[in-house]
Amino acid sequence: MVRVIIEFLGGLDVIVKKQRQYKVDVQLDGKDEINVGDLIQWIVDNLIEHEGDVNVFLENDSIRPGILTLINDTDWELEGEKEYVLEDGDVVSFTSTLHGG
């Protein structure tokens, strides 16, 4: 199990029960280490309310282009993207950069 904070910013909160921040314990059967890829699937399974909203968040089984993903305020590309192994206290932020204006 890992305890993390997940943030949905830039309007993404509308697909996750209109809540911008979650403090969650993520536990997956048979896994000692939980990576960001596991967390993304956990979000789809547990936080996204409507199946149709999954495509707002994901494209081709990864975070949709236009969503900035940070792990502890560092671009996830520098941290290994979906392979980054989460640790207690990590903050994972998803920020949509695509919005009207």
Curated annotation (Swiss-Prot):
Location in chain, cross-link Glycyl lysine isopeptide (Gly-Lys) (interchain with K-? in acceptor proteins): 101
Classification via SUPFAM superfamilies: MoaD/ThiS
Modification(s) after translation: C-terminal thiocarboxylation occurs in 2 steps, it is first acyl-adenylated (-COAMP) via the hesA/moeB/thiF part of UBA4, then thiocarboxylated (-COSH) via the rhodanese domain of UBA4.
Keyword Cytoplasm on entry: yes
Protein's cellular compartments: Cytoplasm
Function: Acts as a sulfur carrier required for 2-thiolation of mcm(5)S(2)U at tRNA wobble positions of cytosolic tRNA(Lys), tRNA(Glu) and tRNA(Gln). Serves as sulfur donor in tRNA 2-thiolation reaction by being thiocarboxylated (-COSH) at its C-terminus by the MOCS3 homolog UBA4. The sulfur is then transferred to tRNA to form 2-thiolation of mcm(5)S(2)U. Prior mcm(5) tRNA modification by the elongator complex is required for 2-thiolation. Also acts as a ubiquitin-like protein (UBL) that is covalently conjugated via an isopeptide bond to lysine residues of target proteins such as AHP1.
Name of this protein: Ubiquitin-related modifier 1
GO terms for biological process, alphabetical: protein urmylation; tRNA thio-modification; tRNA wobble uridine modification
Keyword field: Cytoplasm, Isopeptide bond, tRNA processing, Ubl conjugation pathway
Coiled coil: none
Chief location of this protein within or outside the cell: cytoplasm
GO cellular component: cytosol
InterPro entries: Beta-grasp_dom_sf, Mopterin_synth/thiamin_S_b, Urm1
Pathway(s) of this molecule: tRNA modification; 5-methoxycarbonylmethyl-2-thiouridine-tRNA biosynthesis
Modified residues (1-thioglycine): 101
Similarity remark: Belongs to the URM1 family.
Chain's gene name: URM1
